[in-house]
Amino acid sequence: MPMAKLRNIIKTLSIFFFLIAATAPSLSSATSATDTFVFGGCSQQKFSPASAYESNLNSLLTSLVNSATYSSYNNFTIMGSSSSDTARGLFQCRGDLSMPDCATCVARAVSQVGPLCPFTCGGALQLAGCYIKYDNISFLGQEDKTVVLKKCGSSEGYNTDGISRRDAVLTELVNGGGYFRAGGSGDVQGMGQCVGDLTVSECQDCLGTAIGRLKNDCGTAVFGDMFLAKCYARYSTDGAQHYAKSHNYKTNYGGEKTFAIIIGLLAAVVLLIIFLLFLRGVCSRGGDFSILHSFTLI
């Protein structure tokens, strides 16, 4: 093979490798807003490996993942021979997610809740984009305003105008309808959502409590989260990018590691192609390894 042609192939492969490396981080960041870990919890009651409940729980989690491909909320009950063997569970995606993003989020939540809650009968996991919960104790359709997570930022630099805008946004959330509510005013963004097993009136009551607690407990904080067992309300003062940074949320499944593995595999493929082209050049010269002395990448 002519050396000029070989060099052109190598240059093309190098450009391709660079484009993959340049675009992969942006593709990863597109999902980070839904995949970030918020909180998780497990029940104290355990089940035995290979038990009837474990089988029912696996069926339940599979149903959650499958259902998330076409619905943003659903709940299931997998009946057992006894109440303690019956698995109950639900998932809830954030109201502004597309179906593919919802399905991806729920699948990742399910993959993480097992290691988080090994052999526990109950578990719950909240990612930024979705929520899953399961237990062998009945909880579906029951309003629960227990505070699960409260997080408030600092009040430094938050002026009276900012507080007024924050209060206006939270009032808008209280007065809004539906199970998912979002709004903003200037640099203040707010969001609230109920789990879909609540009635409309229960949702309104739950969100009203969450927002009231958010205003009282976080005061003049630049951001605030109030997660109750069946609803949440949150606000930030300068949009989603600051929101993620100021909360210091981290994913639990190593997106950076996955990216590094992909880049490593691509590099190996490029090197293999270069090596095969090199061998072909050697063979075409009848085994003349003098090509080694003139071989230059670029």
From Swiss-Prot:
Tissues in which the protein is found: Highly expressed in lateral root and elongation zone.
Transmembrane segments: 259-279
UniProt keyword Oxidoreductase, yes or no: no
Residue pairs linked by disulfide bridges in the UniProt entry: 42-117, 93-102, 105-130, 152-218, 194-203, 206-231
Any one of the GO CC terms: plasmodesma
Cytoplasmic side: 280-298
Signal peptide range: 1-30
Keyword Cell inner membrane tagged: no
Extracellular side: 31-258
Keyword terms, alphabetized: Cell junction, Cell membrane, Disulfide bond, Host-virus interaction, Membrane, Repeat, Signal, Transmembrane, Transmembrane helix, Transport
Pfam assignment, any one: Stress-antifung
Membrane topology category: Single-pass type I membrane protein
Predominant location: membrane
Region of interest (Necessary and sufficient for plasmodesmal targeting), residue spans: 259-279
Highest taxon in the source lineage: Eukaryota
Domain Gnk2-homologous as annotated: residue spans: 35-139, 140-240
Compartments, as annotated in UniProt: Cell membrane; Cell junction, Plasmodesma
Quaternary structure (record): (Microbial infection) Interacts with Grapevine fanleaf virus (GFLV) 2B-MP.
Family membership noted in the UniProt record: Belongs to the cysteine-rich repeat secretory protein family. Plasmodesmata-located proteins (PDLD) subfamily.
Function, in words: Modulates cell-to-cell trafficking.
Name of the protein this chain belongs to: Plasmodesmata-located protein 7
Species assigned in the record: Arabidopsis thaliana
